[in-house]
Curated annotation (Swiss-Prot):
Example GO biological process: carbohydrate metabolic process
Keyword Glycoprotein included in the entry's annotation: yes
Signal peptide region: 1-25
InterPro entries: Glyco_hydro_1, Glyco_hydro_1_N_CS, Glycoside_hydrolase_SF
Glycosylated residues, chain numbering: N118, N225, N357, N367, N421
Sequence positions that bind a beta-D-glucoside: Q49, H153, N198, E199, Y342, E413, W462, E469, W470, F478
Keywords: Disulfide bond, Glycoprotein, Glycosidase, Hydrolase, Signal
Name this protein carries in UniProt: Beta-glucosidase 13
Gene: BGLU13
Catalysed reactions, as listed in the record: Hydrolysis of terminal, non-reducing beta-D-glucosyl residues with release of beta-D-glucose
Length: 506
């Protein structure tokens, strides 16, 4: 696997592409026409990061409302998503921007508490929330943009957190399923692509381990400033319940709605690519374990009905088990896989822990770093975790192809950030050459994987707009369009938006 991490990624189609870059200093040209006929290009967003209108239109509080207001110290600039990019009021402007760019599709998420303010169907449906999403969906279709709808992008109802600890309880499976069915009933005549969960890994690890940097902010006391939690058990429990809720919801959709509505349903996962720190067997094994704990945690159940062997051996009784019926239900429970890729790491082997302070962050016995022998794996972006490594994109996509039966894939997020430099004049802030270079090289890498047989059907850039970036608040900007938070969230196209418009011309 050292060879796979360091040599194979230069093989096949990618080698001549990289040679062109090396010789000329510029990547070869690429456009929509480089990709297969019918390939979908879009941009992506999420409700809490974009909408604002936190207390408008009958919306109930989510765990992110509670988290940002009770723990502003956990957000880099002590901000929140009360207003965010104000898409609750400016959605027509956003759709106009997309139409002008020429995108095919828009991936957005529905705020659970805008539909069911109390989290459960028994608490009543909020018709104002239904109207907002109907208006957004209809506006998209009017302008020729397909809606790709995520049902859960981390903003679970605070009412269910208070009632039974949210995703730590199996009770959430039925409440989630009823919420999803409400969406199928209300929007499924027009929505043809559903995503049950966005990045379960990020929600479960950052919310229940890793110092509790995401809502609901739980972790073991020795791992961070958390009021409660167990970093060695709760991440696995929460994600187990997400997988079960996913499987139950997919069965419901396929049995009751798919034939009539003619839609597809899947789940979005995130993974880095991992390059062995050296060619030693221990480091090659560590890179594989890192993939198991980030991607296999979900792909193995979806394909094989059980967690990866490495997880079962290392996590042992802290890892929940599927019953035989659950295993059969989850196996194959998707029409497509959404895959998010941003960055890569080196992986080195770690000795077994002492068994006292168990945590997801050490269970894989892999030391993840972006620097080897003083040299970073690639240029660093604004976020401390994001190093630019386009080759890893190809490697990850081909790894899914080769290890999980070449499923239909949509790249549901890919992007890079810059610092929010408030001293820059607007015209300077719109110059984002690094982002253009990032997208250009990552699209070349993806195209190489497609030409090597990966069944990828679409690509969504993260993100359409600058937005609330979770624990980073507004200190970084991921958008291809600039949002002026000091002037009514006015939108201005960055250079990357112009680049994409040219790229997308048919």
């Amino acid at each position: 696997m050292a060879a796979a991490g360091e040599v194979v990624m230069l093989g096949g189609i990618l080698l001549p592409l990289l040679l062109v870059v090396a010789v000329s200093g510029e990547p070869p040209p690429i456009s929509r026409r480089s990709f297969p006929e019918g390939f979908i290009f879009g941009t992506a967003s999420s409700s809490y990061q974009y909408e604002g209108g936190a207390r408008e239109g009958g919306r109930g509080p989510s765990i992110w409302d509670t988290f940002t207001h009770q723990h502003p110290d956990k957000i880099a600039d002590k901000s929140n998503g009360d207003v965010a990019a104000d898409s609750y009021h400016l959605y027509k402007e956003d759709v106009r921007i997309m139409k002008d760019m020429g995108v095919d599709a828009y991936r957005f998420s529905i705020s659970w508490t805008r539909i069911l303010p109390n989290g459960s169907l028994s608490g009543g449906i909020n018709r104002e929330g239904i109207s907002y999403y109907n208006n957004l969906i209809n506006e998209l279709l009017l302008k020729g943009v397909q809606p790709f709808v995520t049902l859960f992008h981390w903003d679970s109802p605070q009412a269910l957190e208070d009632k039974y600890n949210g995703f730590l309880s199996p009770n959430i499976i039925n409440d989630y399923k009823e919420y999803a069915e409400t969406c199928f009933k209300e929007f499924g005549d027009r929505v043809k692509h559903w995503i049950t969960f966005n990045e379960p890994l990020s929600f479960c690890v950052a919310g229940y381990a890793s110092g509790g940097m995401f809502a609901p902010g739980r972790c073991s006391p020795w791992e961070g400033n958390c009021s409660a939690g167990d970093s060695g058990r709760e991440p696995y429990t929460a994600c187990h319940h997400q997988l079960l809720a996913h499987a139950e919801t997919v069965r419901l959709y396929k049995e009751k709605y798919q034939v009539l509505q003619k839609g597809k349903i899947g789940i979005t996962l995130v993974s880095n690519w991992f390059v062995p720190f050296s060619r030693s067997k221990s480091n090659i094994d560590a890179a594989r374990r890192a993939l198991d704990f980030m991607l296999g945690w979900f792909m193995d159940p979806l394909i094989r009905g059980e967690y990866p062997l490495s997880m079962r051996e290392l996590v042992r009784n802290r890892l929940p088990q599927f019953t035989k019926e659950q295993s059969e239900l989850i196996k194959g429970s998707f029409d497509f896989i959404g895959l998010n890729y941003y960055t890569s790491n080196y992986a080195g082997s770690l000795p077994p822990s002492n068994g006292l302070n168990n945590s997801y962050s050490t269970d894989a016995r892999a030391n993840l770093t972006a620097v080897r022998n003083g040299i970073p794996i690639g240029p660093q972006a604004a976020s401390p975790w994001l190093y630019i490594y386009p080759q890893g994109f190809r490697e990850l996509v081909l790894y899914v192809k080769e290890n999980y039966g070449n499923p239909t894939i949509y790249i549901t997020e890919n992007g890079v950030d810059e610092f929010n430099n408030k001293t820059l004049p607007l015209q300077e802030a719109l110059k984002d050459d690094t982002r253009i270079d990032y997208y250009h090289k990552h699209l070349l890498s993806l195209l190489s994987a497609i030409r090597d047989g990966a069944n990828v059907k679409g690509y969504f850039a993260w993100s359409l707009l600058d937005n609330f970036e979770w624990s980073n608040g507004y200190t970084v900007r991921f958008g291809i369009n600039f949002v002026d938070y000091n002037d009514g969230a006015k939108r201005y196209p960055k250079m990357s938006a112009h680049w994409f418009k040219e790229f997308l011309q048919k």
